[in-house]
Amino acid sequence: MTPAPDGGSATSPGHGVDLARVTANFRQYLLGWGAEERGEGELDYYRSGLATPQFNGVVRTPSLHGVGQAAAKARARLAGLPWWWWVGPDSPEGTPAELARHGLREMGSVPVMVRPLDRLAEAGERAARLRIETVEGPERLAEFVRTYSTSMGIPPGLEDDMARVEAQRSDNADVVRLAAVLDGRIIGTTVVIAAHGHAGIFLVHVSETHRRRGVGTVLTAAALRAGRDRGMDFAALMASPAGAPLYRGLGFTTVSEYRLFALPA
């Protein structure tokens, strides 16, 4: 990876991708979960108040020399909740070793994948009754959240608070929520953040009973279309092991990665 610890431009060789803009998009998405508290500057962090690590954490600290102090601040600001520290191409080189030295353990990594939006992907065949809809209204948003939270394995009982945080995001003007709907019921989800010239694609989830039927491909193709309709140049996402082959088939290539750290249990 090409680090850009000062927030300046960092280009992935051979792809023409500005990683600084990709990570700015990802930071916007994650910081948008900071309903209880968020901070930017010496420590970019977000606290949703939800008792699940996906929605509390640290996105970066700009200085390698300040990692120890930043880790102490993160422990204080995120106390009482599970959280993750995301180490990506916008983090100073050497951050993983410093986090380990200050007691955090590595959980794993996720690839960062991108593709240009100068052409759209083929969605493939879909069930005749499957529709892609933009999510509007509190009832549909609640169903949307229930669908992806169940797929993510988030503990039950958090859906109402998650929907509240989603509805109150300060960047909702940049957000497009797309649902795969079959017979009136949401069976798949994705969220697009159209910002910093990129369509960040998040929360691509399909209900367990409808997987391996092409729904994820249809959703991702719709997300690409939404990004291009909003004038974005590239699409970017963080891929799970199960999703990476699907995204490669849609023209995405891996340009970097995020490494995830957490406090020991």
PLM feature segments, named:
Residues 36-40, 91, 97-102, 174-190:
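Conserved beta-hairpin
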Residues 137-150:
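A short, well-structured alpha-helix characteristic of acyl/acetyltransferase catalytic modules
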Residues 53-63, 197-208:
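Conserved acetyl-CoA binding element of GNAT-fold acetyltransferases
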Residues 157-207:
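A conserved beta-strand-loop-helix scaffold within acyl/acetyltransferase catalytic domains
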Residues 1-80, 91:
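N-terminal charged segments
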Residues 99, 247, 252:
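Conserved active-site tyrosine of GNAT-family acetyltransferases
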Residues 63-139, 239, 261-263:
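Acyl-donor-binding surface of acyltransferase catalytic domains
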Residues 67-75, 203-208, 212-225, 229, ...:
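Conserved acetyl-CoA-binding loop-helix of GNAT-fold acetyltransferases
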